[in-house]
Structures are given as structure tokens and as C-alpha cells.
């Protein structure tokens, strides 16, 4: 089955965009496959569960689908991209970055990976200006406690900064921890459970004024997701004044066309985050790697000192404590 189509795909790496005029499939084979998939679309859940265990989900493609069609994705890039200025204060964010800059000369890890649970710029998903900003945030604001929801390479950065402060500890909530996480000195608690299982009261009891909540989630807004728990249950109930981080946030832009169309990146966390921030008198956006890359690149480049590429997906905001009842 699909012999002709697979022959056409042999020299095309996965995730590669192929324009419509360069056909990479056999019509008859794709029609046959479509009929099979339509039959399986409404198959008993045990069949669909088996497919999901193999890493494949079959879902309907229609007006109500939460996964955008390729036509919808391509069409959405025709008009100008919404700039989402409702949550950004340009002058305030530039001043905040200038405050962080005073510590940026300290953070100078090796460029190439050296292994052994040591941080390097290359070979990890938490790099670019995100890593520099995290280090400088910790050095500038000296949190006593950091809760990391999603831990790993970012924890190595935090450990370096906390050691420079000579104070502070990390609580990691990570259901699939890398082995090196267990050997990081600043990690005092490792909770190997999904964050959805952690009640909001735990966060409120663990964080004091000036502490950090670092979120690097699945980035998905769906039934039972970590994002729903964090943004709808945890954050509104925090009673202390804290700094909050979210990762892989591209605001004020959307995700690039190639990531949506060719890499299946349909992350929607940033839109729930934006809804949380709009007209929220308790919050103020302080730093955004993408924001500065798009609108303040000269200052962001200076912040990096030429050590690695500027940019990234970190967004930091402050949240005031809840008023007393």
C-alpha cells in the first residue's frame, strides 16, 4: 500500500514544505487511504486508543476542529498579523531589560554541549535570550523559592544564578525528569507528577513575595491540560506578589507559518495567557524575548554580548498579591 507515494517521498525529509505544483503523492493511493481513515475515524475507542499509543491520532477536519486545516493556516497569513499591543508597555519593558543588563556579563556558559549535567548554549531547548534573562532575573530579584513547572535545562540556569546569590531553592514539578535533574544542588524537591494533580493551595503556600513561578508547559489548551489548571486555577489564587514566566510564547507575533503547517505546532497557550493578561490590574508584562527581538533588537543584542543568538520564547510578567478579604 502507498508504494508510489512512498517512492515519491523517499528523498523528502519529514517536515519539509513541498509546493502544490510539485506533486508528491499518487492520487489513487491517497484516495484509498482517505477511505480507510474515514472508516477508522468513528471506529470504537479501543482501536483509536491503539493508534494513539503508536503516536497517531485521527480526528475530523471540519469547521469546528481545534486543529486548523492547512488551508486555514495558509490563508491566515495573508492579512497583516495582529500585533497584540494591549499587554505591552514598550518603554517600561526597555527599562526592565536595562535593569537586567547589569548581571548579563556574568552568564557565559560554553557554547557547545559538554555533557554531565552542565549547561551550554547549544543542544538544548532552553537557550538564546531566554537563558540569559532567567539568569539575570534571579540575580536581580533574588527569589527565595522558584517553582518550576517543567524542569530540565532551565533548572541548570537557575542553579547557576542561585549559587551566585548564595541563597534560594527550586521546587521542580516534572513528570518525566532527566536524570541530571536529581543531581542539581539547588533542587530541594522533585515532584514527579503532572501539575494538574497539584492543588492550587500548594503553590500559594510555597511562594512568598518576590518568588518565581516558572512555567514551561505542554503549551496546549485542551480538556484536562496543564495550561487550563495553571491559568484558570493556580494563577488567579496566588495571594503573594510574584514573578511568573511562560515559555515558547511568541507574542506579539503568532507562530511561524512553517511551524504550524509543516511541524504540527498548534500551541495555543499564548492566547490563553494573553486573555489572562488583558485588563488584569494585578499583572504587568516585564520581559519578552520575542517582543524585544522584533521591536528592540539592538538592546537585546547588547544584552547577549555576542555569546549566542538573540531571541527565544520567554515571557515574564509580575503579578501583585491578591487583596485581603
How does the language model describe each region?
Residues 2-245, 249-325:
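A short alpha-helical cap/connector motif
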Amino acid at each position: 500500500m502507498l508504494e508510489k507515494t512512498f517512492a515519491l517521498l523517499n528523498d523528502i525529509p519529514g517536515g519539509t514544505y513541498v509546493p502544490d505544483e510539485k506533486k508528491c503523492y499518487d492520487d489513487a493511493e491517497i484516495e484509498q487511504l482517505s477511505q480507510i481513515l474515514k472508516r477508522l475515524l468513528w471506529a470504537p475507542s479501543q482501536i483509536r486508543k491503539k493508534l494513539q499509543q503508536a503516536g497517531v491520532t485521527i480526528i475530523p477536519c471540519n469547521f469546528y476542529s481545534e486543529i486548523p486545516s492547512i488551508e486555514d493556516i495558509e490563508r491566515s497569513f495573508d492579512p497583516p498579523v495582529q500585533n497584540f499591543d494591549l499587554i505591552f508597555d514598550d518603554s517600561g519593558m526597555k527599562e526592565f531589560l536595562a535593569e537586567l543588563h547589569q548581571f548579563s556579563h556574568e552568564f557565559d556558559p560554553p557554547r557547545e554541549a559538554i555533557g554531565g549535567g552542565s549547561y551550554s548554549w547549544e543542544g538544548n531547548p532552553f537557550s538564546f535570550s531566554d537563558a540569559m534573562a532567567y539568569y539575570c532575573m534571579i540575580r536581580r530579584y533574588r527569589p527565595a523559592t522558584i517553582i518550576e513547572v517543567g524542569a530540565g535545562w532551565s533548572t541548570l540556569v537557575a542553579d547557576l544564578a542561585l549559587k551566585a546569590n548564595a541563597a534560594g531553592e527550586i521546587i521542580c514539578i516534572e513528570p518525566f525528569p532527566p536524570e541530571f535533574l536529581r543531581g542539581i544542588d539547588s533542587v530541594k524537591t522533585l515532584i514527579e507528577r503532572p501539575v494538574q494533580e497539584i492543588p492550587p493551595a500548594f503553590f500559594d503556600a510555597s511562594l512568598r513575595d518576590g518568588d518565581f513561578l516558572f512555567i514551561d508547559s505542554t503549551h496546549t489548551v485542551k480538556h484536562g491540560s496543564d495550561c487550563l489548571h495553571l491559568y484558570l486555577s493556580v494563577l488567579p489564587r496566588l495571594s503573594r506578589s510574584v514573578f511568573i514566566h511562560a515559555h515558547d510564547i511568541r507574542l506579539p507575533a503568532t507562530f511561524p507559518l512553517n511551524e504550524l503547517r509543516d511541524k504540527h505546532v498548534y500551541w495555543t497557550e499564548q492566547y490563553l495567557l494573553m486573555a489572562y493578561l488583558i485588563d488584569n490590574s494585578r499583572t504587568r508584562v516585564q520581559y519578552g524575548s520575542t517582543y524585544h527581538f522584533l521591536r528592540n533588537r539592538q538592546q537585546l543584542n547588547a544584552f547577549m554580548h555576542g555569546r549566542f543568538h538573540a531571541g527565544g520564547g520567554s515571557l515574564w510578567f509580575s503579578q501583585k498579591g491578591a487583596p485581603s478579604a
